[in-house]
């Protein structure tokens, strides 16, 4: 069984036991979160596609870690004008372990 869920403006195809990195969620490490925005659920019988979400479906995941991704460097310049700007940031993420898919 698999599910397609949406969180943080992105979509993820997950199965039980998968590890995914999503945009930061406000949850403590080792707590469980319920992701209710399930767009599709696939089983042996077929696929259930929501409009826009599947009614009564949810994905239960455990928060494994909170962290920051590698630094993204943004460098702007204008040629021949001695204009240089270097910025960077580290995007916060949440590491989730998918425990259960309920449909």
Swiss-Prot record:
> A GO term (biological process) for this protein?
translation
The record's listing under Pfam families reads:
Ribosomal_L21p
Q: Name one GO molecular function term.
A: structural constituent of ribosome
> What UniProt keywords are attached to this protein's entry?
Ribonucleoprotein, Ribosomal protein, RNA-binding, rRNA-binding
Coiled coil (residue ranges): none
Please name the PROSITE patterns in this protein's record.
RIBOSOMAL_L21
GO cellular-component term (any): cytoplasm
Q: Which InterPro entries match?
A: bL21-like (IPR028909), bL21-like_sf (IPR036164), Ribosomal_bL21 (IPR001787), Ribosomal_bL21_CS (IPR018258)
Tell me which family the UniProt entry assigns to this protein: Belongs to the bacterial ribosomal protein bL21 family.
* Known partners and oligomeric status: Part of the 50S ribosomal subunit. Contacts protein L20.
* Function text: This protein binds to 23S rRNA in the presence of protein L20.
NCBIfam families associated with the record: L21
Per its record, how is this protein called by name? Large ribosomal subunit protein bL21
What organism does this protein naturally occur in?
Answer: Clostridium beijerinckii (strain ATCC 51743 / NCIMB 8052)
